A protein has these predicted regions:
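Alpha/beta-hydrolase-fold serine-hydrolase catalytic core, especially in secreted/extracellular enzymes
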Residues: 5, 10, 23, 32, ...
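Short beta-strand-to-loop junctions in surface cap/lid or active-site-entrance loops
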Residues: 33-48, 57-60, 64-76, 201-202
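Gly/Ser-rich "nucleophile elbow"/oxyanion-hole loop immediately N-terminal to the catalytic nucleophile
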Residues: 46, 111-156, 167, 172
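The feature captures the conserved acid-bearing segment of alpha/beta-hydrolase catalytic domains
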Residues: 43, 175, 181-271
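A domain-start/cap signature at the N-terminus of enzymes
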Residues: 1-51, 228, 365-366, 372-375
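Primarily recognizes the serine-hydrolase "nucleophile elbow" in alpha/beta-hydrolase
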Residues: 147-197
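Alpha/beta-hydrolase
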Residues: 53-55, 179
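Active-site machinery of serine-nucleophile hydrolases
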Residues: 58-135
Length: 394
């Protein structure tokens, strides 16, 4: 990579780099791309920082994304919190004769019979995806990044790209936040959310996903694939919707659904276990695919919170609870109780083998579950605002 410019943006250092393609990325012809590094506000080289990886929309490139960051309310998802590094990627510079556009995936409105689209639709990553991952890893090596706090984000096409590139890379990304992603096909194809997986196919425990989309946005077509697939695979999706169209301004979106930013994604760490909630009784009915005229706001899994207490070789404990009014001010009537299935992900030390029987306790309830394919699930736990400790023993 070559440093081509240094600047200051909002009182924070900004660096622009160019990179030449590497043979292992698989491009048919050599190309040069640009990316930007945005420093924390009060940068201290002795500290380590989270990394916010930004995937731009179809209306932007790396340069115009930087311009958005200058103005509050302009594509708020691009804005990097003060105490984090930002990595702004680009897929616009080389769209002719490559699959770079749409970050290597299929859009919500793509013709799935198009040969150019078909060649993107598998578990195999495209050159642009390899380039993005390599750039993330290079950034982590060059700058003081906390390797357990790397997050992907994007708007529209970039929302599709962040899901498509990061969901299968739970070995790198702690979480994903997608604003009105213009398609979920990319993620579904790479992670086999609705397709039969090839024999032996497996991805690392995935990042936690926060997705907020609008049922009256044509670019949200197919969103049921993400919701149904994540639930079936027992991956954690915190999903939000409302009739806010293809919006990118947090304040405007909050007029329709003010729960969206209630979950602190920066609190998620790659090296910490988390519970994947599925089949929750408090989930709202999805507007996709058949209720797109609905004006109702809704959510899936938005009310759950947790805290890991113990993650040891033979014991694991975690507190499960629901959010309350002291956590987040909202127009929504917060539930006092929700029933959900709970699957543990990203266990660090408590790692049973397939076939192992695991004893669990949750308040007065207890039982046994069997580990299968590296995971185990306790069904229909009643989770309340006051919280309760879920315990596992080998």
């Amino acid at each position: 990579m070559t440093l081509i410019k240094e600047d200051v943006l909002n009182g924070r250092k900004l660096e622009l780099y160019q990179q030449n393609s590497l043979p292992e990325w698989g491009y048919e012809k050599p190309q040069t791309d640009t990316f930007a590094i945005y420093y924390p506000k009060d940068y201290d080289p002795e500290k380590s920082y989270p990394l916010w990886v930004v995937f731009h929309s179809a209306g932007h490139d790396v340069y115009s994304t930087i311009e958005c960051i200058k103005e509050e309310g302009n594509h708020d998802i691009y804005h990097v919190v003060d105490d984090a590094f930002g990595l702004i990627l680009d897929c616009r510079a080389n769209t002719q004769g490559t699959t770079d556009w749409w970050w290597g995936g299929a859009s919500a409105q793509a013709d799935l019979s198009d040969p150019e689209v078909i060649k993107k639709r598998s578990i195999e990553t495209q050159p642009v995806e390899k380039r993005c991952i390599a750039t993330v890893l290079d950034t982590m090596a060059k700058y003081p990044i906390d390797e357990n706090r790397v997050y992907a984000c994007g708007n529209s096409m970039g929302g599709s790209g962040s899901l498509g590139i990061a969901l299968s890379r739970g070995d790198i990304f702690a979480g994903i936040k997608a604003n009105v992603p213009a398609g979920v096909r990319h993620a579904a194809d790479r992670c086999c959310l609705d397709l039969e997986a090839p024999e032996g196919f497996k991805i690392p425990d995935p990042p936690i996903v926060v997705d907020y989309s609008a049922q009256n946005d044509g670019w949200s077509d197919g969103h049921e694939v993400l919701y149904d697939g994540m639930n079936a695979k027992k991956y954690l999706l915190m999903g939000f919707w409302g009739a806010f169209g293809h919006a990118n301004n947090h304040a405007q979106i909050a007029k329709y659904n003010d729960l969206i930013h209630s979950f602190d994604l920066f609190g998620v760490k790659k090296n910490e276990a988390y519970p994947a909630f599925t089949n929750a009784s408090t989930n709202d009915p999805l507007p996709w695919p058949s209720d797109r005229d609905s004006k109702a706001a809704g959510q899936v899994n938005a009310f759950f919170r947790w805290e890991v207490i113990k993650d040891e070789e033979n014991e694991f404990e975690i507190t499960l609870r629901l959010i309350n009014e002291s956590d987040w001010q909202t127009r929504v009537e917060l539930p006092k109780e929700s029933t959900a299935d709970v699957t543990m992900r990203r266990l660090q030390n408590f790692k049973p083998n397939d076939g192992d029987e695991i004893a669990w306790e949750y308040g007065d309830a207890k039982g046994n579950v069997t580990c299968k394919d590296g995971i185990f699930t306790v069904e229909k736990l009643a989770i309340t605002q006051s919280g309760c400790i879920l315990k596992f023993n080998k």
